[in-house]
Design a protein with these regions (language model features):
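A short glycine-rich, His/Asp/Glu-containing loop-to-beta-strand
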Residues: 17-70, 76, 126-127, 132-135
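Short acidic-glycine-tyrosine-enriched beta hairpin
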Residues: 91-110
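Short beta-strand segments in beta-sandwich/barrel cores
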Residues: 68, 85-89, 103
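Glycine- and acidic-residue-biased ligand/ion/polar-headgroup-sensing regions
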Residues: 74-92
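A short hydrophobic beta-strand segment most commonly corresponding to one strand
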Residues: 105-109, 117-139
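Short acidic, Pro/Gly- and aromatic-enriched capping/linker segments at domain boundaries
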Residues: 2-17
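Short capping micro-motif at the N-terminus of alpha-helices
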Residues: 25-28, 89, 98
């Protein structure tokens, strides 16, 4: 079967640290998708492969009413929301709410002053997520570095 759709993109929020040590967040898109099967007998699918690294996967349930006061992500990590909603507030004052199917890269290590970000559940249900922590060196001043 021939796939005739155009090359996809996938939006994500990037929580990062600027050159002054302030955490910020902006919305970007993964866009380096290639149409390729994962093996010779499998139909092609769109894949955007990241640089190989060691990773740890954690399935997380944030309880109803949970708030994580100012803290940094322990490592650069991809966070995918499965159910429920949560917020992330960065040091620049920006607050973003995310829900099922939304993706975030948490890379706010090395902030100054208030630490990193605040986060918590929103609404009347817990927030479930899958967190993939990468064994990579965090960057500073490189918003949207994931393509």
């Amino acid at each position: 079967m021939a796939i005739k759709e155009s090359k996809p993109t996938m939006p994500y929020w990037h929580v990062y640290v600027d050159e002054d040590g302030i955490s910020r967040q902006e919305r970007f898109e993964l866009s380096a998708f290639e149409l390729k099967g994962i093996s010779p007998k499998v139909e092609p699918q769109w894949n955007d492969k990241m640089e190989p690294s060691k990773a740890g996967v954690t399935f997380t349930v944030l309880p109803l009413g949970w708030v994580g006061e100012w803290h940094e992500n322990p490592k650069p990590q991809w966070i995918a929301i499965l159910t429920g909603r949560w917020f992330v507030e960065t040091m620049d004052g920006m607050r973003v709410e995310m829900g099922p199917g939304e993706l975030m890269m948490g890379e706010d290590q090395g902030t100054r002053g208030s630490k990193g970000h605040r986060s918590g559940t929103v609404g009347d249900q817990p927030c479930t997520m899958i967190v993939t922590a990468l064994d990579v060196t965090p960057t500073v001043g490189q918003p949207g570095r994931f393509k």
